[in-house]
């Protein structure tokens, strides 16, 4: 759960955010940032720039289940997407969390893969790290 730009958002890694009423906690529905959300998924652990208030996010399997596509985006405190970056990961993997510095985004691709009709099957050989210049 995050409160951002006047909205309470429930976050789950393999879906878009859901808006909720901050008083009643009633679910209002999918929130796509007024049509700006470029990815089918949204991290459950966005990071916030303490100097600017900007929210840094990503979506893995961003074009659908089992795809290696990852989409990173920055959102201004007023809810405007300021940067969108697409990349293809070395494998379709779950990205549980990430770290952000002034110059870098660091991800750990969890050792899970699609196999035998199982969406996420543990595979230690798939453990990878990726560092991107922010």
Identify the function of each model-found stretch.
Residues 44-45, 95-100:
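Beta-rich, blade/repeat-based domains predominating
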Residues 40, 90-92:
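Short loop/turn positions that demarcate and connect the beta-strands within blades
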Residues 10, 105-107:
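Short hydrophobic-aromatic micro-motifs
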Residues 1-81:
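Well-ordered mid-protein domain cores that form the structural environment of catalytic cofactors
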Residues 31, 85-88:
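Short hydrophobic alpha-helix segments
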Residues 62, 111-133:
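Short, conserved, GDST-rich strand-edge loop motifs in beta-rich repeat architectures
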Residues 73, 82, 86, 106, ...:
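Leucine-rich repeat
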Residues 102-103, 132-134:
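Conduit-forming functional cores of very large proteins
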